[in-house]
From Swiss-Prot:
Glycans are attached at residue 39. Residues 1-20 form the signal peptide. The keyword Glycoprotein applies. This is Uncharacterized gerABC family protein DDB_G0291103. It is found in: Secreted.
Length: 108
């Protein structure tokens, strides 16, 4: 294997690794970003702990396909009462609890 081939393989490996680990750079530090679509697609809504508890906007209620957490939070469903503790650094490209999520708070 010559040097050009090695560099090419390293470049492809780095590019593939970057794509696999890229949550979404559009979610700022200190926020939770929610998307209606899976894989961080569709409309986005941002929440920060300064907002305290918030019901999700109508289009996100029981309809969150993915999220990225750049802060800690607690996702809530009211009937039946269920919580999902979320920590900074968490994310999901296909969020199961998003099918029942009602709101988000800074504490459970």
């Amino acid at each position: 294997m010559n040097l050009k081939s090695i560099i090419f393989v390293l470049f492809i490996a780095f590019f593939a690794f970057s794509l696999a680990n890229d949550d979404d750079p559009t979610c700022p530090n200190g926020f939770i970003c929610f998307w209606v679509g899976q894989n961080y697609t569709g409309d986005q809504w941002k929440w920060t702990p300064r907002m305290n508890y918030r019901d999700l906007p109508r289009q996100y209620h029981n309809n969150v396909g993915s999220y990225v957490a750049k802060t800690n939070a607690c996702f809530k469903n009211w009937i039946p009462y269920l919580t999902f503790e979320c920590n900074e650094g968490d994310s999901s490209h296909s969020f199961t609890f998003g099918k029942i999520i009602d709101g988000v708070s800074h504490e459970c």
